[in-house]
Amino acid sequence: MKKNLLLLLCLFCLVNVCHAKAKDTFTVFQLNLWHGCTKVPNGDQGIIDVLDQMDADVVFLCEIRDGKQFIPHVIEELEKRGKHYYGETFDLAIGVLSKFKPDSWTKCCIVPGDEGRAMVKMVATIEGQPVSFYSCHLDYRHYQCYMPRGYNGTTGKKMDKPITDEEEVLKANRQSFRDETIRAFIQEVQSDIQQGRPIIMGGDFNEPSHLDWQAD
C-alpha cells in the first residue's frame, strides 16, 4: 500500500513539474509563403496544413498575398481545427499569428524609400512577462552573394564574369535597404530593452549565412 501511495505521489509530482515546465516555454515558427503559395498546386490548403502540423504559439509569415483577406481566412480555417489565433498584417506582405492575446500591434521600422518593408510588431504578455515579437522581410534587391557566382544580385541574370573583389561585393550589397531597416529595428527595440521585454524577430532577412562565403 505504501509503495502504491509513493508511486502515485511521484506521478503527481511529475505531472505538476511537466505542467509547470510547459508554462515556461512557447514555440515560434517562421514561414515564407513564396508568392503566397500561388505558384504551388493547392498551396492555400498546404499553408493551413503546415500551420496546423507545426501548431506554433507564434507564427511569423512573409510573402503574404492580400493580407486583409488572407489572415482572417487562415484564422478561420485553423479555428475549425481547434486552434485559436489572433493575427495582423497592416496590409503588408508580412504578418504575425499568435495564440497569445496581443497587448498591442504596431507597424514600425519604416524606412524612407522602402516603406513597403516595414515590420509588424506584437507585444504579448506570456505568464506575466511581456514579450515583443517582430515580423520582417528585408529588401530582396542587391542580394550580392550571387556576384562571386557570376550572377547579378538584383536581376539574377548571368554576368560576363564572376566578381570576387570583397570591397566591390560589399559596396553593391549596401545599395539595398537591409542595413537601414536593421538600424531602424535596433532603434525601435531600445524601448523594449528599457522596459525589460525579451525580443524575438523572425522573417526573411535576404542575407546569406556566413557559410555561403566559404571557398567551396
Residue ranges and their predicted role:
Residues 2-3, 18-80:
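N-terminal, active-site-proximal structural segment of metallo-dependent hydrolase catalytic domains
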Residues 4-14:
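Sec-dependent N-terminal signal peptides
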Residues 25, 129-130, 195-198:
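Short coil/turn segments at beta-strand junctions that form active-site/ligand-binding loops
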Residues 30-44, 66, 141-177:
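Acidic/histidine-rich helix-loop elements
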Residues 31, 62, 136, 202-204:
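Active-site flanking residues adjacent to catalytic metal/cofactor-binding acidic residues
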Residues 62-152:
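Structured beta-strand-rich core segments of catalytic domains in phosphoester-bond hydrolases
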Residues 150-216:
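Metal-dependent phosphoesterases centered on the DNase I-like endonuclease/exonuclease/phosphatase
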